[in-house]
């Protein structure tokens, strides 16, 4: 079971009814099911903030010391490393609950990127959601090898939902 809490701090998000708890749960489940280590956990929790440029800028300054708005910020609740997701992680077997973390999405940046990249807002949001969930479970793109692995997973998951590769 995946419990999703959504906070909408910007009304433009309400125009996109497809972006809801059901979609977020479905995407999250599709990411997690790829890793056997998560199979013993009965309940996951994920917090989503749907916000605007001003708030994402504040968050990016506060937590990353970057003076720029961004499309999405991920705040993992656990210190996971994707390299370990394919081997047995003992700590995951001691609990049947896991709070994955928090994700903040910026409407204006996602909207502008979707227009520039000629894709639907919803499809771009889904890509950013997959990307951010992968960050929550320990993936990153700090070097080319890790970026290629993360992007390959994103492409695979997007294709499951009928969305073409963004790369």
UniProtKB/Swiss-Prot annotation:
This protein's UniProt keywords: Cytoplasm, Endonuclease, Hydrolase, Metal-binding, Nuclease, Ribosome biogenesis, rRNA processing, Zinc
The keyword Ubl conjugation appears for this protein: no
Localization (cell): Cytoplasm
Co-factor binding details: Binds 1 zinc ion.
InterPro entries: MetalPrtase_cat_dom_sf_prd, YbeY, YbeY_CS
Main location: cytoplasm
Pfam families: YbeY (PF02130)
GO biological process: rRNA processing
Required cofactor names: Zn(2+)
Broadest EC class assigned to this enzyme: hydrolase
Binding positions for Zn(2+) per the UniProt entry: 131, 135, 141
PANTHER family for the chain: ENDORIBONUCLEASE YBEY, CHLOROPLASTIC
Recorded family membership: Belongs to the endoribonuclease YbeY family.
Function: Single strand-specific metallo-endoribonuclease involved in late-stage 70S ribosome quality control and in maturation of the 3' terminus of the 16S rRNA.
Protein name: Endoribonuclease YbeY
Organism (species): Rickettsia prowazekii (strain Madrid E)
């Amino acid at each position: 079971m995946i419990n999703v809490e959504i906070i909408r701090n910007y009304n433009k998000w309400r125009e996109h009814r497809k972006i809801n708890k059901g979609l977020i749960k479905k995407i999250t489940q599709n990411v997690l099911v790829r890793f056997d280590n998560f199979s013993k956990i009965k309940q996951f929790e994920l917090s989503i903030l749907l916000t605007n440029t001003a708030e994402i800028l504040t968050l990016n300054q506060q937590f990353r010391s970057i003076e720029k708005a961004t499309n999405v910020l991920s705040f993992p609740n656990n210190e996971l490393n994707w390299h370990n997701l394919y081997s047995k992680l003992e700590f995951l077997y001691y609990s049947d609950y896991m709070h994955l973390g928090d994700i903040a999405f910026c409407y204006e940046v996602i909207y502008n990127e979707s227009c520039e990249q000629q894709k639907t807002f919803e499809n771009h949001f889904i890509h950013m959601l997959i990307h951010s969930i992968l960050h929550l479970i320990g993936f990153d793109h700090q070097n080319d090898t890790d970026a290629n692995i993360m992007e390959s997973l994103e492409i695979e998951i997007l294709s499951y939902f009928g969305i073409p590769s963004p790369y």
